[in-house]
Amino acid sequence: MKNKSIYPWVVVGLLWIVALLNYMDRQMLSTMQEAMKVDIVELNKAEAFGALMAIFLWIYGFMSPVAGIIADRVNRKWLVVGSLFVWSAVTFLMGYAHNFHELYWLRAVMGVSEALYIPSALSLIADWHEGKSRSLAVGVHMTGLYVGQAIGGFGATAAAAFSWQATFHWFGIVGIAYSLVLILFLKENPIHNISIKKIDDAPKEKKPSIISGLSLLFTNWAFWIILFYFAAPSLPGWATKNWLPTLFADSLNIPMSEAGPISTITIAVSSFIGVILGGILSD
């Protein structure tokens, strides 16, 4: 663990699994409508199911900037551990939901907890990787998201084999257990802690306020270009991720237990290749 050349990649490996769980838990719901609507009748309406998917994205979007501010001020290891534990507990509790409203609010809490993860994780990776390994490390970490997305497609397969309640329970238990593993093995970079201490101990230097930081950001044209770059593909991207399993099942008459994996794997494979190549080229 103390080997400086190895541990930065151990961090990537540890967070890779968290990234997998992050997308797996959010994606699995999109493939489980058919199994769940037998017990929760509101899910027979496309509008209700769409609202269930949308509340997560709305809250995730609004919380992401807040999560970045929090990650700059709180121990990031514990932020990662806490967010993983909460969203995994939410996944577990979704197996006990009896109506649409319970699912709706649990999905909202998941949006808050999952939003806290990415800023903390990327900041940790950046601290442990300097120079030419940083972009590759971020790219490798991002592949965990897409593998998790692909595995989430098997939620319908597991629900068909067992039950949707058991699927949520076991997926949630895996995340809760792994949060305990992170407590033991995930570490902050000591250099980061030293840098923070120097800033705190410097009496003459005035810390920039959140408002001044946001003002600087919002007046930067590069920020708006990058924001548009990510927003433009996200609209059709999330619509596709959330509804492609249903489209395959309804329009192509493919059983949802097969439509789920097919729809998520096809998107995940291309994304996986893209982030790895992008990381290598960026370095």
Could you say what each language-model-derived stretch is?
Residues 29-30, 218-275:
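Extracytoplasmic gate region of multi-pass secondary transporters
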